[in-house]
Swiss-Prot record:
GO terms for cellular component: cytoplasm. The keyword Protein transport does not apply. Its cofactor is Zn(2+). NCBIfam families: thrS. Belongs to the class-II aminoacyl-tRNA synthetase family. It comes from Porphyromonas gingivalis (strain ATCC BAA-308 / W83). Zn(2+) binds at C338, H389, H519. The gene is thrS. This is Threonine--tRNA ligase. HAMAP family: Thr_tRNA_synth (MF_00184). Homodimer. Catalyzes the attachment of threonine to tRNA(Thr) in a two-step reaction: L-threonine is first activated by ATP to form Thr-AMP and then transferred to the acceptor end of tRNA(Thr). Also edits incorrectly charged L-seryl-tRNA(Thr). PANTHER family: THREONINE--TRNA LIGASE, CHLOROPLASTIC_MITOCHONDRIAL 2 (PTHR11451:SF44), THREONINE-TRNA LIGASE (PTHR11451). One of its GO terms (biological process) is threonyl-tRNA aminoacylation.
């Protein structure tokens, strides 16, 4: 008998060779119907894979990320099976599950192309194959046999992948007449897949290398129920309306120019207003929490990034070194701000009394993203991080972690991100050799993160083995208005850079000690955060943040002078106002400015100019009546002050 322990600490004994499917059935028929994969000692397994020794087991359903991953991974294989039947001789690259669905990179063959118009036929074949409920079979085979199998099919992409694997056992999965190289896990059979939609076709270079062949990437989504697919497609339509690229253009927030370069956004005046207000917002909070603002160059000596290890990590994703007239001197566009902050820390000797030291910077960094990976503001080549690095004593770690969490909570509340969750990434329970830093420091850091979450009442999922080699971390995932998950805000403990840069402080014992370093970026990057904020709010930003709070609309040209006088009076009270004095009918002006998401419209005509008043319309609410200019100004000032005081109160308590 073997002992199976469940997440709640309870356990049961089973015969050796039991499977996740059998365990689910022993608990309840409904669970067996819903379960998609099994977690066995921290690894995700197929449901029919045998468990032969004591294990910690967790059963994953659709609502679990691991369940969706297995479902969508099997859907990618189902698509590949359909493609192989429809396009004999097709070759396969990789076909993973992704955050929302799956894709497969394929090579249809010389002179053959797969277009969007072909997707319905592929979809239909997938549905037919799914209806057969083909069993998905996992096999372990020798590397030589795998090379021979895929070599006989002349599938050079799979042969290349297999050749790079270590000698030993290779895992394949078979369903019907289709076999693929894969680690898994997968569903028990194709019949679980009830609803399928292939979404788009794109190009993708083999292994992300622009010098290699461009393959055809087919994206899809699938669900266990048709109703789920219908809801998802409705969500997609709403997401298209909220696309930050579309709204950013409509609101004149940012743009791109091929003359400047792909992936290098240009912030237009209205977008710059928005971004600067976000930066000022965070600077105010950071000032309260004792941060010091710093500025570092956009470039650094290549040796700096060799010391930090970033050159080895980002070398392939960086722009080429900048050579100077001096022989042997090379500079790099900055891929990260942390090496520069380490150098700032080193400039001045520090005592234990000086710590913690908190250095903050809105620092622009550069990484070369392939053209096919660029996407609006979410994937760019130059972006600004709201970076800060804290240098503290080990005994200060928990307190500093809590304070950073407070900053993130204030930001989420102020910007109406009400639904968020967290993940704590800790070391592997068994394999500890790859981690830098002492056992004592790691235990202290991991305990500090867990206790900080408990003290703040933050529910957090603990993931073992997900920590970076240099320290544990806490990631925040927010749900936007459409229910999509975005990673915003990371707090990372680092024992690596203090070692690499030989950072030290003098302790109470008069000896030299290494500080603990904490990386944190609540926004992540300004570009990506603004993109998420646009899509979350559909461009209807909070009144304190929006670039233009008010627009004045004269009903005809003869009231332009009065409209500009109203705007001047509001401007003098720091209210952000524009005048729309185009020679258009007022109805057209109202419609146009509603599309610009400007919160308040002030309509001025004969009566308003004579009485020194304005007719007020509020975005989404309509007519608010006629007011004196000063009355309206006081109204908008109070609305803004109430918003700002709400989040100021959070950090001043």
């Amino acid at each position: 008998m073997i002992k199976i322990t469940f997440p709640d600490g309870n356990f049961r004994e089973y015969e050796a060779g039991i499977t996740g499917w059998d365990i689910a059935g022993s608990i309840s028929p409904r669970l067996q119907q819903d379960v998609l994969a099994a977690g066995v000692n921290g690894q995700v397994w197929d449901l029919h894979r045998q468990i032969n020794e004591d294990a910690e087991v967790k059963l994953f359903k659709w609502d679990d990320a691991e369940g969706k991953h297995a479902f969508w991974h099997s859907s990618a294989h189902l698509m590949a099976e359909a493609l192989e039947e429809l396009y004999p001789g097709i070759k396969f690259g990789i076909g993973p599950a992704i955050e929302n669905g799956f894709y497969y990179d394929v090579d249809p063959g010389e002179g053959i192309s797969i277009k969007d118009a072909d997707l319905p036929a592929i979809e239909k074949r997938m549905q037919d194959l799914a209806a057969r409920k083909e069993t998905i079979i996992r096999r372990d085979i020798a590397k030589a046999d795998a090379l021979r199998m895929f070599g006989d099919k002349d599938d050079q992409y799979k042969v290349e992948l297999i050749s790079e694997l270590a000698d030993g056992t290779i895992t394949t999965y078979t369903q019907g007449g289709f076999t693929d190289l894969c680690r898994g896990p997968h569903l028990p059979n194709t019949g679980y897949i009830k609803a399928i939609k292939l979404l788009s076709v794109a190009g993708a270079y083999w292994r992300g290398d622009e010098k290699r062949k461009q393959l055809t990437r087919i994206y899809g989504i699938s669900f266990p129920k048709k109703k789920m697919l219908d809801e998802y497609l409705e969500l997609l339509e709403e997401a298209k309306k909220r696309d930050h690229r579309k709204i950013g253009k409509e609101l004149e927030l940012f743009a791109f120019s091929q003359n400047v370069g792909a992936g290098l956004p240009l912030w237009l005046p209205r977008g710059t207003q928005l971004r600067l207000r976000l930066e000022d917002f965070l600077k105010q909070i950071q000032k309260h929490f004792g941060y010091q603002q710093v500025i570092t160059p956009h470039i650094g000596n290549k040796n700096l990034y060799i010391t930090s290890g970033h050159y080895a990590k980002y070398g392939q994703d960086s722009f080429r070194p900048i050579n100077t007239p001096q022989e042997g001197e090379e500079f790099m566009l900055k891929p990260m701000n942390c090496p520069h902050h380490c150098e700032i820390f080193k400039i001045t000797p520090h005592s234990y009394r000086d710590l913690p030291i908190r250095l903050a910077e809105f620092g622009t960094v550069y990484r070369y993203e392939q053209s096919g990976e660029l996407h609006g503001l979410t994937r760019v080549r130059g972006f600004t991080q709201d970076d800060a690095h804290l240098f503290c004593r080990p005994d200060q770690l928990k307190e500093e972690f809590c304070k950073v969490m407070d900053i993130i909570f204030i930001i989420f509340k102020a910007l109406d991100f009400k639904n968020f969750e967290a993940q704590i990434s800790l070391r592997d329970k068994v394999n500890r050799e790859k981690y830098i830093g002492s056992e004592e420091n790691w235990e202290r850091a991991e305990r500090a993160i867990i206790e900080a979450c408990e003290e703040k009442g933050l529910p957090a999922v603990i993931e073992y083995g997900e920590a970076a080699f240099y320290g544990p971390k806490l990631d925040f995932m927010v749900k936007d208005a459409l229910g999509r998950r975005w990673q915003l805000g990371t707090i990372q403990v680092d024992y690596n850079l203090p070692e690499r840069f030989d950072l030290e402080y003098t302790g109470e014992d008069n000896k030299k000690h290494r500080p603990v370093m904490i990386h944190r970026a609540p926004f992540g990057s300004m570009e990506r955060f603004v993109a998420v904020l646009i899509e979350h709010t559909a461009g209807k930003f909070p009144l304190w943040l929006t670039p233009d709070q008010v627009v004045v609309l004269p009903v005809s040209e003869r009231f332009n002078e009065y409209a500009h006088r109203v705007a001047k009076e509001l401007n003098q009270r720091d209210i952000r106002v524009q005048v729309d004095d185009r020679n258009e009918k007022v109805g057209r002006k109202i419609r146009d400015n509603e599309l610009k998401r400007i919160p308040y419209m002030l309509i001025v005509g004969e009566n308003e100019s004579r009485e020194e008043e304005v007719s007020v319309r509020k975005q989404g609410e309509g007519d608010m009546g006629i007011m004196k200019i000063t009355t309206f100004a006081e109204l908008i000032e109070k609305e803004v002050d109430d918003m700002i005081s709400a989040w100021r109160k959070d950090y001043q308590n």
